[in-house]
Structures are given as C-alpha cells and as structure tokens.
Amino acid sequence: MEARAKVMKALAHPTRLFIVDELSRGERCVCELTEKIGADVSTVSKHLSLLKGAGIVLDDKRGVQVFYRLRVPCILNFFGCVEAVLEETSRQPVAIGE
C-alpha cells in the first residue's frame, strides 16, 4: 500500500500532473518543461525528482541537458479514470460527510 501511496502522492500536484501530461506527448528536456511551466529550473527539477523517485519518469542525460520520458505510459489510464470520476461527480454531487 505504501508504494501505491508514493505514486499517488507524486501525482498529487498540478505541476506534476502537467509534466506527466506533457511527457505523454514524448520526451522533453528540463529546459522545455521549465519554459512551459514558467518556473525556475530548480523547481521543475524538484518536481521531476519526485516523479522519478515514484517510478513515473525516467531521465537520460545528454551532455548538459537532461531529458525525461514516461517510464510506464499506462499511467495515462489513471488520468482517464480521474476524468470519469469528475464527470460522474459533476452529475451527482456528493454531500460532505458521506
């Protein structure tokens, strides 16, 4: 259960979700992600480090640049499941405390 929680925790941030979504289109260097996110390199690197530690992404250093890609593309299936939950919830709001 703790390993699952680690993966879920790594995905539990809007910036990291954006990174995973961006990597679904192919590998990206840190510089590209930094530009798209609008954050400094150290912040983006920290997010990538958490994703790597959870086994979600792999890195490949080429010269001075580091490129990242999804380790297991099926992680995107989780996004579809989240969308289904949100869609269902929007139809029938859940009362707090249920």
Predicted region positions:
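Beta-hairpin "wing" of winged helix-turn-helix
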Residues: K52-R62, R69
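Amphipathic alpha-helical dimerization/coiled-coil segments
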Residues: M1-A3, I75-E98
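Regular, well-ordered alpha-helical segments
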Residues: A10, G53, A84-E87
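N-terminal helix-turn-helix DNA-binding core of bacterial DNA-binding proteins
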Residues: E2-S42, Q65-I75
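Exposed, low-complexity/repetitive linear segments and helix-based recognition motifs
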Residues: I37, I56-V57, G80
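Short, hydrophobic-biased segments on the C-terminal half of alpha helices
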Residues: L48-S49
